[in-house]
Amino acid sequence: MHELSITEELLKTIVAKAEEAKARKISRINLVIGEYAGVVEDSVKMCFDILSQDTMAKGALLEFKRIPAEFRCRLCGHTFPSGQHALVCPKCQGWNAEVIAGNEFFIESIEVDDESQSS
C-alpha cells in the first residue's frame, strides 16, 4: 500500500508548514487528487488517522477535491475528458493521446489554529 509512504510524507510537510506558521493545531487539510493519480482516499484517511495521533494534526479533517482526467490528442491537438475509450481521440480517432490533467496530488491548503488563540 503506497498510501502509507505518501501519507507519511504528506504529514511531515503539513506539520512543517504549520510549525513555520507558529500554529498550535492543524484543523483541516484540503488535498487535490487527480482521477489518475492512483491514490485511494480511504487509505490516505486511514493512514493519516493512525500516523497523526501524536502530532498537532491529530483529529484534523481531510478534504479531497477530485480532478477529472483530461487528454490531448498529439495528432490533432483536440482535448477531451476520459471516457469509455479514454486514449482514442473522439475527433480524429487517433490513438496518440497524452494526459494533461488528472495526475495531480498536492496540498491545496492547511487550516490551523495559531498560538494566540485560546482553547
UniProtKB/Swiss-Prot annotation:
User: Does the entry feature the keyword Chaperone, yes or no?
Assistant: no
> What's the family?
Belongs to the HypA/HybF family.
The role this protein plays is:
Involved in the maturation of [NiFe] hydrogenases. Required for nickel insertion into the metal center of the hydrogenase.
This one is known as Hydrogenase maturation factor HypA
Q: What positions does the entry give for Ni(2+) binding? A: 2
> Which BP terms in the Gene Ontology apply to this protein?
protein maturation; protein modification process
Q: Which InterPro entries match?
A: Hydgase_Ni_incorp_HypA/HybF_CS, HypA/HybF
Q: Which GO terms describe its molecular function?
A: nickel cation binding; zinc ion binding
- What are the entry keywords? Metal-binding, Nickel, Zinc
Q: Which residues bind Zn(2+)?
A: 73, 76, 89, 92
- Specify the species: Dehalococcoides mccartyi (strain ATCC BAA-2266 / KCTC 15142 / 195) (Dehalococcoides ethenogenes (strain 195))
